[in-house]
Amino acid sequence: MTPDILPTDGYEHQLAEKSARLQAMMSPFQAPAAEIFRSPAEHYRMRAEFRVWHDEDDLYHIMFDQQTKLRIRVEQFPVASLLINRLMSALMTAIRAEPILRHKLFQIDYLSTLSGKLLATLLYHRPLDEEWQQKARELRDQLREQGFDLQLIGRASKTKIMLDHDYIDEVLPVAGRDMIYRQVENSFTQPNAAVNIHMLEWAIDVTQHASGDLLELYCGNGNFSLALARNFDRVLATEIAKPSVAAAQYNIAANHIDNVQIIRMSAEEFTQAMQGVREFNRLKGIDLTSYNCETIFVDPPRSGLDDETVKLVQAYPRILYISCNPETLCANLEQLQYTHKISRLALFDQFPYTHHMECGVLLEKRD
């Protein structure tokens, strides 16, 4: 696969291969047939990063071939959203003509939304001065005149310059409601917005008859917490990254949701708090014992859940587990299978044309 050509004719085959692979991995745990959620065959990725190559008077985006490590010039990138593709061309044309903006520019990061907003970060191997800021403002205004709803950011060593602000707001149609999600530059967001909608709607569906409260670990900007709030009395969610916590708090207010509480701590710290091993000032004013959490939601990093967190989640009647790495999910299921059974399984094709799989399982306590 080259950056400018996607093997769209092979989309169905690669999806069928992933489905078979996931089903085989889950068969030792008596999993039901997987529900399959497709991605758009192209223009599905809402963010992209490119190195910038200087060749005398020319300047262009590049990527590196994963096998040969050779650089590849990138004019169009069908993996990324149409909005990013449009901006790539317009932005590079403008920068190419301005020496102050192109000098020691080595990378450009793009973030886009289904709501039509864009954020571009220009990364430099040099200090950014007032002259750079003036030219960057002119560039931003020029691109806005071309119809781009754009935020522009400059980065250099220990420097971050925001011309306006460092976020854009996404609006996702989720199970009959428009959900607003603030997305902060350089913070995690789901890369495939269409598949993210599938994940949110599946999570809502599998918990529609849930009772009590929901506990979520690793909540990020509140992506799942806010969508799932409609199915629960209250939601208690943890997140460690400050920008994500701030975005989550904004999203709670923007969506007029009054039953979600975000606390800034790691899953490991929360486990210690629940077990009474440590006390945390961050939990002052929050009575953990008042929550009747019958469902726990986890969307861990690729490494999966650590042993202590596995023990923590086993205490809950229902576990909703979204995994970006089925191998570590299976490792966790080796322990979870003794207390819970898989009642729903889903494959989300978040990363088409790669071996990566995103999946979800609903686990329910054995009788």
From Swiss-Prot:
> Can you tell me which family this protein belongs to?
Belongs to the class I-like SAM-binding methyltransferase superfamily. RNA M5U methyltransferase family. TrmA subfamily.
Mind telling me which Pfam families this protein's record contains? Answer: tRNA_U5-meth_tr (PF05958)
GO molecular function annotations of the record: rRNA binding; tRNA (uracil(54)-C5)-methyltransferase activity, S-adenosyl methionine-dependent; tRNA binding
Asked whether the keyword tRNA processing is assigned, the reply is yes
Instruction: List the active-site residues.
Output: C324, E358
NCBIfam families annotated for this entry?
trmA_only
Q: What is this protein called?
A: tRNA/tmRNA (uracil-C(5))-methyltransferase
Give residues annotated as binding S-adenosyl-L-methionine.
Q190, Y218, N223, E239, D299
> What CDD domains does the record tag this protein with?
AdoMet_MTases
Listed GO CC annotations:
cytosol
Physiological role: Dual-specificity methyltransferase that catalyzes the formation of 5-methyluridine at position 54 (m5U54) in all tRNAs, and that of position 341 (m5U341) in tmRNA (transfer-mRNA).
The protein's UniProt keywords, in alphabetical order, are: Methyltransferase, S-adenosyl-L-methionine, Transferase, tRNA processing
Q: What is the catalytic activity of this protein?
A: uridine(54) in tRNA + S-adenosyl-L-methionine = 5-methyluridine(54) in tRNA + S-adenosyl-L-homocysteine + H(+); uridine(341) in tmRNA + S-adenosyl-L-methionine = 5-methyluridine(341) in tmRNA + S-adenosyl-L-homocysteine + H(+)
The UniProt entry's GO biological process terms, in alphabetical order, are: tRNA methylation
**What's the Enzyme Commission number for this chain?**
2.1.1.-, 2.1.1.35
**Is the keyword tRNA processing in the record?**
yes
- InterPro entries on file: MeTrfase_TrmA_AS, MeTrfase_TrmA_CS, SAM-dependent_MTases_sf, TrmA_MeTrfase, U5_MeTrfase_fam
